[in-house]
C-alpha cells in the first residue's frame, strides 16, 4: 500500500509535464500494471469499516469513483481496488465516437482544477459491455454504476432513443445506471434538464426499465446526473420530477461553465467544463437545495471538488448519502480515497 501511495507524489511532476489527456492515459496504464502485479489488491481491504446503503445497494463504504475517469470500463478492477465502495464508468454512447478535437483537457494547478471538453469520447456500447463483462469487481462484492449518454450526431429531439438503447444494453451488467444529461460538451444536452424535456425522457426510461426488470427479474436503480449551474427554480423542478418517475438517485454535480474561480489563470478561457476545487461550493448549494425539496425520497450522491476528507464530510453534511471522486485523484493521488473513507467512517460514529 505504501509503495503505491508514495509513488504518485513522486510521479506527479513528470505526469504534469505531459499533456493532461496523455498523462491520464499513462496513469491508467500504470495503475493497471500495478493491479495485474498484485500491488493494489490489499488496498481494498485496508480501509476502515464504513458500510452504507445507497439506492437500496449495500456499499463497503460511501466513497465512489465518478464517471469519466474510465470511459470504456477497461480498468474497473484496478480502480475499484484502490479502496472505493463503488465504481461508476462511462459515459458510454450507443455508437463509438472520437469526441472533440485535441487538445481537450487542461490543468489549472493553482486552482486545483481541470477544464475538459472531451465530448463523450468512447468505443461504443458493444465494446463497453465486453469490458464490463470481463471485470471481476461485481463478483467480488463491488458495486458498479454504468453511465449512459447520447451520441453527438443524434438530434436532441431523438436523444431518448440513444438512452433507451444504452439502458437496455447495460441493464443486465449494472448495479445502477446513471443518465448523464449534464455534460456541457455535447451540444444542447443540458436542455434535457428542463422540466418538460426531463419529464418526457424519464417517463420513457422508466417504462423501459419496468420492462427490463420483468425480463431480467431484477430491479436496477436509475440515477440522473445534473449540472451545478442550475437556478433554484430549475433545481426545484428537477426535485419534483425525479420521484414522480421513480428515479432512485441524483448525482450532484457535473462540471461547471462558470469561470469566476479560475479567472486570469492559464487555460481559464478554454471551452469546456471546469472540475475540481471550484465546483465544491457550487455542488454543495445544489445538494442542500435538493435535500430540502426531496426529503428522503431520492438518494443524493455528492461529487465535485472533493480534495480532502473534510470536503467529503461537507458533502454528506449537506445531504448526500455517498460521494464520488475524480479531479481530486489527479491532484492528490490514490491516498485521497482512504482519507475520505476514514473521514466518513469517523463522522458516522
Curated annotation (Swiss-Prot):
InterPro entries: Aldolase_TIM (IPR013785), DHO_dehydrogenase (IPR050074), Dihydroorotate_DH_1_2 (IPR012135), Dihydroorotate_DH_2 (IPR005719), Dihydroorotate_DH_cat (IPR005720), Dihydroorotate_DH_CS (IPR001295). One of its GO terms (biological process) is 'de novo' UMP biosynthetic process. GO terms for cellular component: cytoplasm; plasma membrane. One of its GO terms (molecular function) is dihydroorotate dehydrogenase (quinone) activity. It is a peripheral membrane protein. PROSITE patterns: DHODEHASE_1, DHODEHASE_2. It catalyses: (S)-dihydroorotate + a quinone = orotate + a quinol. FMN binds at residues 67-71, 91, 147, 180, 225, 253, 276, 305, 326-327. Pfam families: DHO_dh. Its EC number is 1.3.5.2. Pathway: Pyrimidine metabolism; UMP biosynthesis via de novo pathway; orotate from (S)-dihydroorotate (quinone route): step 1/1. Its cofactor is FMN. Binds 1 FMN per subunit. It is an enzyme of class 1 (oxidoreductase). SUPFAM superfamilies: FMN-linked oxidoreductases (SSF51395). Transmembrane segments: none annotated. It is found in: Cell membrane. The active site is at residue 183. Belongs to the dihydroorotate dehydrogenase family. Type 2 subfamily. Catalyzes the conversion of dihydroorotate to orotate with quinone as electron acceptor. NCBIfam families: PRK05286.1-1, PRK05286.1-2, PRK05286.1-4, PRK05286.2-5, pyrD_sub2. Monomer. This is Dihydroorotate dehydrogenase (quinone). It comes from Bordetella parapertussis (strain 12822 / ATCC BAA-587 / NCTC 13253). The gene is pyrD.
Amino acid at each position: 500500500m505504501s509503495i503505491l501511495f508514495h509513488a504518485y507524489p513522486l510521479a506527479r511532476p513528470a505526469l504534469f509535464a505531459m499533456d493532461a489527456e496523455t498523462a491520464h492515459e499513462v496513469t491508467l496504464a500504470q495503475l493497471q500494471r500495478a493491479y495485474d502485479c498484485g500491488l493494489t489488491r490489499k488496498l481494498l481491504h485496508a480501509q476502515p469499516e464504513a458500510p452504507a446503503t445507497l439506492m437500496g445497494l449495500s456499499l463497503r463504504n460511501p466513497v465512489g469513483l465518478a464517471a469519466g475517469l474510465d470511459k470504456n470500463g477497461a480498468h474497473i478492477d484496478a480502480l475499484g481496488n484502490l479502496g472505493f465502495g463503488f465504481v461508476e464508468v462511462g459515459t458510454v454512447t450507443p455508437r463509438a465516437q472520437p469526441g472533440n478535437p485535441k487538445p481537450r483537457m487542461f490543468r489549472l494547478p493553482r486552482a486545483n482544477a481541470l477544464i475538459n471538453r472531451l465530448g463523450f469520447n468512447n468505443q461504443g456500447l458493444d465494446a463497453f459491455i465486453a469490458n464490463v463483462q470481463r471485470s471481476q469487481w461485481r463478483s467480488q462484492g463491488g458495486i458498479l454504476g454504468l453511465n449512459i449518454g447520447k451520441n453527438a450526431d443524434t438530434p436532441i429531439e431523438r436523444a431518448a432513443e440513444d438512452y433507451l438503447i444504452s439502458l437496455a444494453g447495460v441493464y443486465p451488467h449494472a448495479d445502477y445506471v446513471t443518465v448523464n444529461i449534464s455534460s456541457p460538451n455535447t451540444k444542447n444536452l443540458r436542455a434535457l434538464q428542463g422540466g418538460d424535456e426531463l419529464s418526457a425522457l424519464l417517463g420513457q426510461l422508466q417504462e423501459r426499465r419496468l420492462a427490463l426488470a420483468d425480463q431480467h427479474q431484477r430491479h436496477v436503480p436509475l440515477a440522473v446526473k445534473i449540472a451545478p449551474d442550475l437556478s433554484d427554480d430549475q433545481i426545484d423542478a428537477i426535485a419534483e420530477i425525479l420521484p414522480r418517475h421513480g428515479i432512485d438517485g441524483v448525482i450532484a454535480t457535473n462540471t461547471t461553465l462558470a469561470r469566476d474561480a479560475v479567472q486570469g489563470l492559464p487555460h481559464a478561457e478554454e471551452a469546456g467544463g471546469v472540475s475540481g476545487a471550484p465546483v465544491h461550493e457550487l455542488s454543495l448549494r445544489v445538494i442542500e437545495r435538493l435535500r430540502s425539496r426531496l426529503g428522503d425520497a431520492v438518494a443524493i450522491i455528492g461529487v465535485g471538488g472533493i480534495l480532502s476528507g473534510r470536503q467529503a464530510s461537507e458533502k454528506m453534511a449537506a445531504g448526500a448519502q455517498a460521494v464520488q471522486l475524480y479531479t481530486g485523484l489527479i491532484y492528490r493521488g490514490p491516498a485521497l480515497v482512504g482519507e475520505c473513507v476514514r473521514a466518513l467512517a469517523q463522522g458516522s460514529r
